[in-house]
Amino acid sequence: MKIAVVVHDYLPRHVGGTEIHAHQVASELVRRGHEVVAFSTERDLEAPEGDLRSFELDGVRGTEMVHQREYADVRESWTQSLAAETLRSLLARERPEVVHFQHLSLWGSRGIAIARERGARVVVTLNDFFLLCDDAVLLDPELELCTRAERGECSQCLRRHPLRPERWLDAPQGLELEEYWERAALERYEWHKRDLLLADVVVCPSRFLADRFLAAGMLRESQVRVLKYGYPGERHAPRPSDPSQPLRVGYVGGIYPSKGVHVLVEAMAQLAGEPLELSIWGALDWFPDYVAGLRERAAGAAVRFEGRYPPGEVDRVLQGFDVLVVPSIWYENMPLTIQEAFRNAVPVVTTDLGGMAESVEHERSGLLFPRGDAAALAAALRRLAGDRALLQRLAEGHPHVPQLGEVVDQLEEFYAGVRSPGAAR
């Protein structure tokens, strides 16, 4: 079977959960004898927008399109006319039987309709809330949980896009500008809703995420397949924690506000002088002002900023922890780091919210704490530091973590299956 995988960014330059998962699936499909082509984008201010470049990684042949990610009119951020026409030509050239969209950012949801026009089966994986929320995390500008996206009331967040005034000759002003943003927000919602309803199968890694899209009217239940991520590598047995040593607390992932790293650092500041130490792993150069604030608040606490790590070394990093903390202040979907921790028999302390709460059973595979509550997080960590028997029980109580092969088995069924009942033609 010939399969096209479409994603906004790709390895090795972009090392995020979606990019890693997309490539792991693609390379496993190649190993099974399928022909896989990947389409991605790359920002390059020195190259003309729309330029195409070839790459190959682990048997996956790919094409990346230069995309400068700036728009004269905010509507371009979802219509993506250049990207859509580029995708049309790539699909005409490659003629895949299946198109699997791992992320629609920078390509635009119109790609779903284009793939259908080509006669391909269409599978979409919703790795976050991007089609529902322009910022993908369902937070308002004050970092509070947002429910307006389900009604297409996103005008405030749309204003964040970089515009090119020199190309925007008829820019609206005053009240007209306010109306423009309101209309644009509703148009974005309707645009994505229309296109997503065309997909044959929509893979949702968590039930929580599926329910949010269903509530917004952007999916039919008949399209939905809830399928957790799968992971290569062996499962590890629990390791005892030495009560004579400080509790080794770890964080792995993006270091920016929605990930709630400030909540964890504040908790550690409250625990200064107690037998705990924290290692923070992740890129320190993406949000330098935020990181500077974290360093300032961490002064005097046992906190180390470790920086990046190669994706292939996640087991080594996780096995250096007694407990992983996932303190995100947004809903998350199905955090890869939680599942990786379970595969390594590392218990998890995480926010009682969204996909995190769906992943971790309180008092069985980890502990939950209220969103943004540093004092509650500190209390949970203090409890684990003083009760290593509890820590061991939590390490032994992790749920089954699917292997990559199990997940690709399911995807092959989706690829080969008939179109969903009631899917648009």
Question: Could you tell me what each predicted segment is?
Answer:
Residues 20, 251-270, 375:
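A conserved mid-protein helix/loop that constitutes part of the nucleotide-sugar donor-binding site
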Residues 1-53, 118-120, 269:
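N-terminal subdomain of nucleotide-sugar transferases
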Residues 362-363, 367-374, 383-388:
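Conserved acidic donor-binding segment of nucleotide-sugar-dependent glycosyltransferases
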Residues 167-223:
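A short, active-site helix/loop in glycosyltransferases that binds the activated sugar's phosphate group
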Residues 277-292:
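Glycosyltransferase donor-sugar binding loop
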Residues 389-417:
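A charged, aromatic-enriched C-terminal amphipathic alpha-helix characteristic of glycosyltransferases
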